[in-house]
Amino acid sequence: MQKRKTVLDIQRMKAEGEKIAMLTAYDYPFARLMDLEGIDMVLVGDSVGPVVAGYDHTLPVTMDEMIYHCRAVARGLGQAFLVADMPFLSYQVDLREARLNAGRLVKEGCAQAVKLEGGEPVAEVIRTLVDMDIPVVGHIGLTPQSIHRMGGYKVQGKHDQQARQLMRDARAVQEAGAFAVVLEGIPAGLAGQITEALDIPTIGIGAGVDCDGQVLVIHDILGLCEKYSPRFVKRYADVASIIRQGVKEYIGDVKQGVFPGPEHSFS
């Protein structure tokens, strides 16, 4: 039985040049399957809102929802490192709220670390959580909780001023004590520069190949989100078609009186 990965294992992977593979999970079955295949890190993302609950974006997701999904995922993991997103309004109000909510994700949700969005403006929050021994993953670039300010899901850091600010954000997150940082929706060249400049691992999503690791939404790589697929997603399977075909055959069997057959019935 493999032991659960720790912060030290993730940092060692960067030091040794081993790429870090990370995926989202929102329930026990998916978590168990990806853990069996050796995924390094699992993120219970607030992306559960649009991906699982059908929300338009991540902003409506609550702490209670995050804890519920985090607990389910934790039960499916044996060796992967578990990170939980801090949802909107769970850390922006004040430091006391941030400490309480991060603590709940660890205590009730069984997370090993929390992730929060922002650079320089959230450095104090990161420092506060690290001081209470909660590992933190930063998240800069395209931050989904900021979509109203950004005007949607737009690539960040394309202009010199933006790029310089993102470098400052990355350094601020590291100096505040984060052990890793997600770089989302930024030019590949800039992501490479940030990765080179930091001692902590960078996890890219739409940020090119030079990051220390990659993260994607499990439903995206399996083709379960049929309406929209971001450019940075590679689809590894078409599970939606398999599900629809299975449902179609089941409906047909029920309508025709073929199911349940004798082998599915008790005597």
UniProtKB/Swiss-Prot annotation:
Pathway: Cofactor biosynthesis; (R)-pantothenate biosynthesis; (R)-pantoate from 3-methyl-2-oxobutanoate: step 1/2. It holds the Pfam family Pantoate_transf. One of its GO terms (molecular function) is 3-methyl-2-oxobutanoate hydroxymethyltransferase activity. GO terms for cellular component: cytoplasm. Keywords: Cytoplasm, Magnesium, Metal-binding, Pantothenate biosynthesis, Transferase. Mg(2+) binds at residues 46, 85, 117. It is found in: Cytoplasm. Its main location: cytoplasm. GO terms for biological process: pantothenate biosynthetic process. Binds 1 Mg(2+) ion per subunit. 3-methyl-2-oxobutanoate binds at residues 46-47, 85, 115. InterPro entries: Pantoate_hydroxy_MeTrfase, Pyrv/PenolPyrv_kinase-like_dom, Pyrv_kinase-like_dom_sf. Its EC number is 2.1.2.11. The active site is at residue 184. It is an enzyme of class 2 (transferase). Its cofactor is Mg(2+). It catalyses: 3-methyl-2-oxobutanoate + (6R)-5,10-methylene-5,6,7,8-tetrahydrofolate + H2O = 2-dehydropantoate + (6S)-5,6,7,8-tetrahydrofolate. Belongs to the PanB family. Homodecamer; pentamer of dimers. Catalyzes the reversible reaction in which hydroxymethyl group from 5,10-methylenetetrahydrofolate is transferred onto alpha-ketoisovalerate to form ketopantoate. NCBIfam families: panB (TIGR00222), PRK00311.1 (NF001452). This is 3-methyl-2-oxobutanoate hydroxymethyltransferase. It comes from Syntrophotalea carbinolica (strain DSM 2380 / NBRC 103641 / GraBd1). The gene is panB.
